[in-house]
């Protein structure tokens, strides 16, 4: 898999030097072919080839790429879904907010409800990316994000809860549109899993330190 990862990285570097026409004629067909292959290893490689060509191709080809990526998100093999989740965080940043809301948020929700915690934990980064792309004033989509955030916070898997605790400063406002919820972190500090408690306490400690540095002393008039 290391060789495959290095090959994907090399292909993406090559893509940056290709013209839009070359990307449409050679790179995109390669991406689609790998994504439709019978072997999951080929699909895993294909997952990493969507971000680099996206902005270089026509709207019609972009739509084709999104549709094919959707099939990877819903693949039967957990390894493929994991790789799709890993790359989706970068992929959504290439798109306008309207497309993210209409097409990518449903994909995110599908992954966030996956039966494998190894897939669900990767959706934390996707949540952060989506919330950065979608304007704050689009309350309907942020309502979906907030619901997903709460589900991840209360996930049955400690690995997912740990990931949320570790990235809490990123998933809290202004990104997701809710006020900072210290009680959630405080509750995490009492969870039985040591790693989750440690991560949460670290965040609370950093917040306390930051607050003490920014708080100015008050002086009374004589």
Where are these regions (language model features)?
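Alpha-helix N-cap/helix-start positions at coil->helix boundaries
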Residues: 1-2, 40-41, 78-79, 98, ...
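Hydrophobic residues within the alpha-helices of tandem HEAT/HEAT-like
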Residues: 10-18, 34-35, 49-56, 72-73, ...
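Alpha-solenoid HEAT/ARM repeat scaffold
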Residues: 5, 9, 25, 44, ...
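HEAT/HEAT-like alpha-solenoid repeats
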Residues: 1, 21-35, 59-73, 98-112, ...
């Amino acid at each position: 898999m290391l060789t495959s990862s290095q090959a994907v990285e090399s292909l993406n570097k090559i893509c940056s030097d290709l013209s839009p026409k070359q990307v449409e004629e050679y790179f995109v067909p390669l991406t689609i072919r790998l994504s439709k292959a019978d072997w999951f290893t080929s699909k895993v490689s294909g997952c990493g080839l969507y971000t680099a060509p996206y902005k270089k191709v026509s709207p019609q080809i972009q739509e084709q790429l999104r549709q094919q990526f959707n099939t990877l998100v819903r693949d039967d093999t957990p390894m493929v879904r994991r790789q799709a989740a890993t790359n989706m965080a970068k992929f959504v940043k290439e798109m306008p907010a309207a497309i993210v809301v209409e097409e990518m948020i449903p994909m995110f929700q599908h992954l966030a409800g996956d039966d494998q915690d190894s897939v669900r934990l990767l959706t934390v980064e996707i949540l952060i990316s989506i919330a950065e792309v979608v304007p704050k004033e689009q309350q309907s989509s942020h309502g979906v994000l907030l619901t997903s955030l709460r589900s991840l916070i209360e996930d049955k898997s400690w690995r997912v809860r740990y990931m949320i605790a570790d990235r809490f400063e990123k998933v809290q406002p202004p990104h997701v549109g809710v006020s900072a919820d210290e009680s959630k972190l405080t509750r995490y500090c009492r969870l039985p899993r040591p790693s989750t408690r440690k991560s949460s306490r670290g965040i609370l400690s950093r917040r306390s330190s930051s607050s003490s540095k920014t708080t100015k002393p008050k002086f009374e008039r004589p």
